[in-house]
């Protein structure tokens, strides 16, 4: 189940998931509020203290849970191996989403972290991070300008409630990206490591 960065949330481009589909994995792209044809008046995906932002986080959580409900209802999908993949905004939202539903069994977070911007307490991401307990792989750039290593990536990694031996923080000598070859190699290895069947 995927939550994209906001740039990709406007246009669909499934080719970036070819490496997963070629290995037999299903890729689920829920149509979250404010993405694809559900674009609305939300001014920014950055956290803020408005009621509008709080309401959006709650609705994104509902969209996420509905997507999981759908996967679980299907006989042709293995819901026991459900993995979350979040990219940028999706890596940040993982702080909240992974904490609100325990049916996801592992996660790969691509260039995510905690944000500096404050939001209402009910949806403040760091309040949820310690409730993330499944295996998590974080793939980040050392020089990321959106999620800096020392102030966004490392705090998120340390706050997660995942046992130390089930979480990994891969740091590339890059900015707000990790080379595609690295993403593919690390992502597939993580999926294989935590498959239950």
Tell where the protein language model's regions lie, with residue ranges.
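Cap/lid segment of the alpha/beta-hydrolase catalytic domain
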Residues: 1-62, 119
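Conserved alpha/beta-hydrolase "acid-adjacent" motif
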Residues: 145-152
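Gly/Ser-rich "nucleophile elbow"/oxyanion-hole loop immediately N-terminal to the catalytic nucleophile
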Residues: 44-88
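Short glycine-enriched nucleophile-adjacent loop
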Residues: 91-102
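Alpha-helical scaffolding within the catalytic cores
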Residues: 92-93, 118-127, 152-157
């Amino acid at each position: 189940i995927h939550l994209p960065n906001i740039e990709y949330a406007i246009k669909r481009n499934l080719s970036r998931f070819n490496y997963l589909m070629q290995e037999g994995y299903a890729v689920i792209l829920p149509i979250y509020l404010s993405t694809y044809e559900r674009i609305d008046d939300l001014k920014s995906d950055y956290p803020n203290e408005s009621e509008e932002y709080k309401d959006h986080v709650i609705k994104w959580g509902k969209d996420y849970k509905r997507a999981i409900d759908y996967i679980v209802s299907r006989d042709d999908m293995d819901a026991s191996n459900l993995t979350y993949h979040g990219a940028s905004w999706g890596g940040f939202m993982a702080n909240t989403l992974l904490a609100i539903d325990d049916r996801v069994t592992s996660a790969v977070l691509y260039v995510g972290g905690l944000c500096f911007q404050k939001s209402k307490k009910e949806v403040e991401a760091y309040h949820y991070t310690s409730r993330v307990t499944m295996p998590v792989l974080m793939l980040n750039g050392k020089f990321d300008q959106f999620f800096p290593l020392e102030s966004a990536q490392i705090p998120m990694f340390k706050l997660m409630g995942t046992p130390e031996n089930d979480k990994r923080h891969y740091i590339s000598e890059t900015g707000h990206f990790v080379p595609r070859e690295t993403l593919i190699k690390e992502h597939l290895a993580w999926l294989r490591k935590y498959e239950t069947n």
